[in-house]
Amino acid sequence: MRLNTLSPAEGAKHSAKRLGRGIGSGLGKTGGRGHKGQKSRTGSGVRRGFEGGQMPLYRRLPKFGFTSMKSAVTAEVRLNELTKVEGNVVTLETLKAANILTKDIQFAKVILAGEVKSAVTVRGLRVTKGAKAAIEAAGGSIEE
């Protein structure tokens, strides 16, 4: 077997539709576009959500909500990521230094995911109840 002798399995590839190549092809004349109308013309069609001039659904419904900018600068930190920090004190700065958080993150919360094996001191970060219990069970502490 050589690369130049490889070919797809029989029936695996379908031949392309050749539009406008005579009546016998089944796709001659109108080429599968039907007769007349906006969608039969070349370079034409309607945009997404267009309903023929009727007020479209996305404009009939009221606006709602917004995206909080605080969510863009907030991150979650798993328990097993705390072990990647050098030393046993975990702060926002040490997490950034260990490449766990990006430099634009301003707030972080330690969540109960993974395991913490060594005693660590978490300083200045928010911590969930479960994560707090796990850190204290491993001999660590949480400082505000």
UniProtKB/Swiss-Prot annotation:
UniProt entry tagged with the keyword Glycoprotein: no
Residue ranges, compositional bias (Gly residues): 21-31
Lineage: superkingdom: Bacteria
One GO-annotated biological process of the protein: translation
Xref: Pfam families: Ribosomal_L27A
Molecular-function GO terms, alphabetical: rRNA binding; structural constituent of ribosome
Subunit field text: Part of the 50S ribosomal subunit.
Annotated family: Belongs to the universal ribosomal protein uL15 family.
HAMAP family named in the record: Ribosomal_uL15
Protein name: Large ribosomal subunit protein uL15
